Amino acid sequence: MKNSAICTATLSWNDQGTPISTQFDDVYFSNQDGLEETRYVFLNGNCFPQRFCTHSRSSCVIAETGFGTGLNFLTLWQAFDAFRQQNPDAPLKRLHFISFEKYPLKTNDLKAAHQRWPELEIFSQQLYQQWPQPLAGCHRLIMANGAVTLDLWFGDVNDLLPTMDSSLHGKIDAWFLDGFAPAKNPQMWSEQLFTAMAQFAHPEGTFATFTSAGIVRRGLQQAGFNVSKIKGFGRKREMLAGVLATQKYQPLPAPWFARPSASHNDDIAIIGGGIAGILTALALLRRGAQVTLYCQDVAPAQGASGNRQGALYPLLNGSNNGLEKFFTSAFTFARRQYEQFSAQGIDFDHQWCGVSQLAYDEKSSKKIEKMLATEWPNELAIGMNCHQLSEKCGLDIHHHGIHYPQGGWLCPAELTKAATELAQQQGMLCCFNHQVTALSHNQHGWQLHLMHQGQSLNAQHKTVVIANGHHLPQFEQTEKLPVTAVRGQVSHIPTTTDLSQLQNVLCYDGYMTPANPANQHHCIGASYQRHRLDNEYSETEQQENRDRLLKCLSDAEWVNQVDVSAKQSRQGIRCVIRDHMPMVGNVPDLNKIMTDYQDLPEKIRTGSPITDAPCYSNLFVIGALGSRGLCSAPLSAEILAGQIFDEPLPLDNEILATLHPNRFWIKKLLKGRKLKIEKP
């Protein structure tokens, strides 16, 4: 599906104050009482809230066709919240709601639709605060301190379902089959939809729907559901409800990109004290895991996560490929998460001042032209001429470009340190000054071999996440991962009267931030030195940072005030990869891949059974975040935690494949090229 702006719903309102979709000429809920209709049809029809009490797993997963006003979600959340307050010791801790919506409402329309139900306000306010841009794809919203997850998939449900990742197979406990009436919206009520409902349903998963149309009843029966007609709501004579009776076997697509969950998710070690490790820890803690973090430094954020200012904006390329799709989703998720951190009292310097990417030469101009050929929501990206950019930036900018209104800058060092403190408050055990030198697998899980103050130690954990930045290849299990260490130097520039006028982040063949009010310095950067691992100050790189700015904005007089003579800077080492995508998932077992998967193309051609690509059990990686960890780390951490806990993931199968740690080797094999066994 194209990752771009989608049409929002256009509404009218009838005499009863009920919203009507002009696209479908149908009401969003009953004129009689929408809230009671939801409780009767979708909650009672699926045996909620009573069913919460007998649910034996920690998470209950609900899927819905047609989010509409969100009334079904809010009503179920209200019931779940009451259940949790009355049953704090029950096994069920979390609610995961997945909904598909072709025409999302605007925020103001959403608020107007909810006015008649003040009892839902405590829940609807949280929805408004995170309501996403009208951007195709999945938007994950985390609410109630992690107890409630809402995955909003914007787009046509029948276009989206074939792209869903195998993490959804067999996970849905109940379906809310909503959407406009079959007579008004016949395209949605398809055989493809009913088949997918059965495929994604948990064994004995249920469904309920307001309609009793024969095409719906027969379609669900053919898909494998036992279907019953029951009394409809209000004046409606009948509705349908049922349970999955027969789950037809469906071979999972692309087993070479399988994502096995952890067989043990209660005891997890994380190696690394940067933003990737800390955000992964928080995501795991939200799910109830016991987390121990090992960091070779004396404090968090001593590596690449320790900079004063880092820019946050999406990575667009106009190609509608996995990279662009991932980074648009990652950016919007990151903004939501950072705002939640602020609301939780995590204190870190930041300004959501916008980011302006400049067309400073012919190559960058063509690149931006290609990016703007896609119709993006104005909240995400908007093209501007040089006069508009100058007004937006507060300084003369003699170039056109693209502006990201919701971008900005934040302090990675402060964010990482404050997030670490929050994780510790939530129960994470931190072992600083503990260097993990090796990993070995045994019958109890993974043994970590440590050095602490000159002494050799061992620690045992069931599951391990490697999040150690450019040190990623240091272990035997990860030494062949195709990542590269790249040094970068960021220059710290004292502000001046003119430079202090800069209102947003500038991106050119480098970047420059507005002055941080806390220290009255700008950051410009950053150099790019491959395979250099020292953290020493470089005068050459300091001058290169300044020269790039002067070259790209040669017509602007104010750039001459950029003074690097004080030699203030910070050096760090990035972990980068050729395709610029993070590595998120299971650590692949390359030796077994080379023995078990060399004939992959032949097996595909002949239809022979293909096992999942070999990987190390209960060993995971989040790395290769490069220069964009502030953007990619929050969503990457959420994906990894979801995988470890065997949850539905908030990206489609195409994007998840581009994040898989084995992707380079699998791509070679799929092209018919043999993998060479390299001698150590």
From Swiss-Prot:
It is found in: Cytoplasm. Residues 1-245 are annotated as: tRNA (mnm(5)s(2)U34)-methyltransferase. Its cofactor is FAD. The gene is mnmC. It comes from the Bacteria. In the N-terminal section; belongs to the methyltransferase superfamily. tRNA (mnm(5)s(2)U34)-methyltransferase family. One of its GO terms (cellular component) is cytoplasm. Coiled coil: none annotated. Its EC number is 2.1.1.61, 1.5.-.-. SUPFAM superfamilies: FAD/NAD(P)-binding domain. This is tRNA 5-methylaminomethyl-2-thiouridine biosynthesis bifunctional protein MnmC. InterPro entries: FAD-dep_OxRdtase (IPR006076), FAD/NAD-bd_sf (IPR036188), MnmC-like_methylTransf (IPR008471), SAM-dependent_MTases_sf (IPR029063), tRNA_MAMT_biosynth_bifunc_MnmC (IPR023032), tRNA_MNMC2 (IPR047785), tRNA_S-uridine_synth_MnmC_C (IPR017610). Keywords: Cytoplasm, FAD, Flavoprotein, Methyltransferase, Multifunctional enzyme, Oxidoreductase, S-adenosyl-L-methionine, Transferase, tRNA processing. Catalyzes the last two steps in the biosynthesis of 5-methylaminomethyl-2-thiouridine (mnm(5)s(2)U) at the wobble position (U34) in tRNA. Catalyzes the FAD-dependent demodification of cmnm(5)s(2)U34 to nm(5)s(2)U34, followed by the transfer of a methyl group from S-adenosyl-L-methionine to nm(5)s(2)U34, to form mnm(5)s(2)U34. It comes from Photorhabdus laumondii subsp. laumondii (strain DSM 15139 / CIP 105565 / TT01). It catalyses: 5-aminomethyl-2-thiouridine(34) in tRNA + S-adenosyl-L-methionine = 5-methylaminomethyl-2-thiouridine(34) in tRNA + S-adenosyl-L-homocysteine + H(+). Pfam families: DAO, Methyltransf_30. One of its GO terms (biological process) is tRNA wobble uridine modification. One of its GO terms (molecular function) is flavin adenine dinucleotide binding. Its main location: cytoplasm. Residues 271-680 are annotated as: FAD-dependent cmnm(5)s(2)U34 oxidoreductase.
